[in-house]
Amino acid sequence: MADLEKTKQIKNIEEKAYELGFDGFGITSPKIEKAGENFSKWLSLGFAGEMQYMARGEDKRRDLNLVLENVKSIICLRKNYFTEEKSMDFLKFPDKGDISLYALNKDYHDIITTRLKELEKTIQSELVDCRTKIYVDTGPILEKPLAEQAGLGWVGKHTNLLSQDIGSWYFLSEILVDVELPQSEMAENHCGSCRSCIDICPTDAIVSPYVLDSKKCISYLTIELKGVIPTEFRKAIGNRIYGCDDCQIVCPWNSYAVKTEEVAFKSVDSNFLLIDLIQLNEEEFRKRFKGSPIKRIKRRGLLRNVAVALGNSNNPKAVPFLIKALEDKEPLIRAHIVWALGELMGSKCIPILDENLAKEKESIVLSEIEAVQDRFHKNS
């Protein structure tokens, strides 16, 4: 009788999840020993780069009892954000910035958190006196291994979660519960011998199947990294100004992707002309990207990325705008502008940089100027 009651409760919770717009529902145990070991090894290899929050939350990621005492079950949820077909054709338009598909929409954290809170009410109503904790990739939780255990998909060689029915274009979220619930069947891995994601990566960030060196990943370089983008990766970034979808674009399983019915995830902005973006002031940036995930990297982060993309654009029309941007108040932006001018103008940029050198005080900008000067002096 108790089992029948529990089954009915789970059915009601699952139905509510789908009613709220989630596309996948599964339940698993909080025990992830192997994934925890792999995570610690990944950290020890330095693959987290400057994402120090990863190491700070290591203990909690490996033991979810430190997140919710006496946690017994994890309800894993999937939310499709696929809005439009995407191909590698964006590389044919170097004057336009490429944005990760998920970031063309409103910030998913706000949308999904609201839905999770609604589902949380249903859980607490069905499972009386239970304690819960919700997450939308913002806390110390190994959500992809958990989602794999919960049957929502398998972790692919690119380290994204894949499913046979909708590919990988979706967000994950979780609700921790201190009640023992029947577990879903774990998903099987269907990557086989495919290497498409590994071979397409512009920076060779997938150092081996299922292992990503974040320090090389363009998503890390354009979003997580707060400082200067290492010179050796700038050409490979191309016109990608927020994230990178290459490994997902070429994945065969994404041919099964189904467009989301979520109105909030319909693309709200797709015009990212680099010359327009490099001219954005602080107020214009805030207005344009209000409610967008892009606001996370702030104006200085976005224009840093735009400067790199302009350097890769082979567009001489960008030069006057880059020269003007040498006066930007943000040293991080100015530093990458210097590199971009070197790429577009060659040695002709030296007089401009020499003039700027006399008034520049910031070390990161001075280093870039000296690097460009050295490069062309050696070649002269």
Each PLM stretch: what is its role?
Residues 1-190, 359-363:
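Auxiliary alpha/beta "docking" domains used to position bulky ligands
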Residues 161-186, 214-233, 281-283:
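Short, charged low-complexity linear segments at domain edges
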Residues 183-192, 234-242:
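Immediate flanking context of iron-sulfur cluster ligation sites
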Residues 196-220, 226, 240-264:
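Iron-sulfur cluster-binding cysteine motifs and their immediate structural context
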Residues 233-267, 284-295, 301-308:
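C-terminal amphipathic alpha-helical segment
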Residues 284-288, 315-327, 346-358, 379-380:
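Amphipathic alpha-helical scaffolding segments comprising HEAT/armadillo-like alpha-solenoid repeats
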Residues 299, 329-330, 361-362:
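Short inter-helical turns and helix N-cap capping residues of alpha-solenoid HEAT/ARM repeat scaffolds
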Residues 303-313, 334-346, 366-379:
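Structural detector for internal amphipathic alpha-helices that build alpha-solenoid repeat scaffolds
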